[in-house]
């Protein structure tokens, strides 16, 4: 697991993220972007993906074979104790959601997991709870707990390690 605090240095991008009232409108909705090698970033979320994975990645993703790296599955999640949003995110592994849904009823569902995943906290918040818990030693062992913090990026093998968000 890699944790980077104060990840985004571009103040204008941080301000845009903070001020965008629509950023969390589609809570939990599946979204896909093929990456800058297929189309330019058109949304703030796609620009954020570029900032994390293309401009500042510790890996040289633009040189990866496009067959291996086909794009970015992403979604936003907002958790709170109010009734408008869920208060937790249950334990799960990340997977190619579209491929899973397309094959679940075939009798031979295909489970394809990502090489790596990330969690980024784009806005300032004052919450109790909401820890990202990563079960790197298995779901029955003690998890690693990471607090939600503005401008914090967490990178981990999200398809291999079960993870969840604790109650807010």
Regions picked out by a protein language model, each given a short descriptive name:
Residues 1-154, 159-168:
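Fe(II)/2-oxoglutarate oxygenase catalytic core
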């Amino acid at each position: 697991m890699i944790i980077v605090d104060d990840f985004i240095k571009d103040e204008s991008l941080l301000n845009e993220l903070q001020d965008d009232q629509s950023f969390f409108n589609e809570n939990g909705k599946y979204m896909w972007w093929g990456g800058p090698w297929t189309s330019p970033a058109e949304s703030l979320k796609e620009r954020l993906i570029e900032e994390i994975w293309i401009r500042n990645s510790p890996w040289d993703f633009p040189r990866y074979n496009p067959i291996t790296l086909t794009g970015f599955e992403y979604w936003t999640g907002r958790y709170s104790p109010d009734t408008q949003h869920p208060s937790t995110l249950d334990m799960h592994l990340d997977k190619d959601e579209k491929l899973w849904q397309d094959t679940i009823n075939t009798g031979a569902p295909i489970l394809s997991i990502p090489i790596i995943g990330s969690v980024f906290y784009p806005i300032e918040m004052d919450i109790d709870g909401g820890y990202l818990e990563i079960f790197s030693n298995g779901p029955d062992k003690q998890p690693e707990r990471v607090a939600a913090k503005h401008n914090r990026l967490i990178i981990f093998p999200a398809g291999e390690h079960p993870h969840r968000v604790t109650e807010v």
